[in-house]
Swiss-Prot record:
UniProt keyword terms in alphabetical order: Ribonucleoprotein, Ribosomal protein, RNA-binding, rRNA-binding
GO biological process, any: translation
Keyword Coiled coil set for record: no
Gene3D superfamilies in the cross-refs: 3.40.1370.10
Family recorded in the similarity comment: Belongs to the universal ribosomal protein uL4 family.
Protein name: Large ribosomal subunit protein uL4
GO cellular component: ribonucleoprotein complex; ribosome
SUPFAM superfamilies referenced in this protein's UniProt entry, alphabetically: Ribosomal protein L4 (SSF52166)
Key word RNA-binding present: yes
Length: 224
């Protein structure tokens, strides 16, 4: 069992949160699994829909635009030629196959678990009490949010905030306070967490309830 310190809005340690050892279970080549997962996410976000028509696919008559001789113009075969407006495209993009990358559910969950464990082991994850997200601010105030990060010794560099979905109607003051900080890269909910968000964030601030829900989901699926 791993114990993580829990902080309040003033940066004071007010308790500890238990994290199951199974969260840190070895998955063999974990770095390769994380790499495959990130590649799949980035590849599948692309549309892969860029497609152009060549001269044989555009809708044009095959009739010569003018006679071969006597006009003074260069000879032309048809208006589908690339040099004409509306003609075919030469060497344009054309998807030759489905380039989406598939990754199964078990691999996806394992990658997220490894990324979360990695943040904990490198001290890049800060657990805060649920009141920080719900009751700490009575009104949006950026200075208060910035002071909170400094009091908790959170490095102001690519910070991801993770909260529980139950607080969606109660954490508006904190969300609005963080919105003006360039170091804050996102505010997400544990149930919708994406491994790419975890990988791209340098520091993570998570509520106790969100962490417990996330760990429980990842660990239970590992046992299955």
């Amino acid at each position: 069992m791993v114990l993580l310190s829990k902080f309040d809005f003033s940066g004071n340690k007010i308790g500890e949160v238990e994290v199951a050892d199974s969260l840190f279970a070895d998955e063999g080549d974990g770095l390769q699994l994380i790499k495959d997962y990130i590649v799949a996410i980035r590849a599948n976000k692309r549309q892969w829909s860029a497609c152009t028509r060549n001269r044989s696919e555009v809708s044009h008559s095959t009739k010569k635009p003018f006679k071969q001789k006597g006009t003074g113009n260069a000879r032309q075969g048809c208006l589908a030629s690339p040099q004409f407006r509306g003609g075919g495209i030469v060497f344009g993009p054309k998807p030759k196959f489905n380039q989406h990358v598939r990754i199964n559910r078990k691999e996806r969950k394992a990658a997220i678990r490894l990324l979360l464990a990695q943040k904990i082991q490198t001290n890049k994850l800060t657990v805060v009490d649920d009141t920080v997200f719900v009751d700490a601010l009575t009104a949006p105030k950026t200075q208060s949010a910035l002071r909170f990060l400094k009091d908790c010794n959170v490095e102001c560099r690519s910070i991801l905030f993770i909260d529980h979905l139950d607080h969606v109607e109660k954490n508006e003051n904190l969300r609005l306070s963080l919105r003006n900080l360039t170091a804050v890269k996102g505010f997400v909910y544990g149930i919708n967490i994406n491994g790419y968000d975890l990988a791209s964030a340098h520091n993570i601030v998570i509520s106790k309830k969100a962490l417990q829900e996330l760990v429980e989901r990842l660990v239970s699926e590992t046992k299955d």
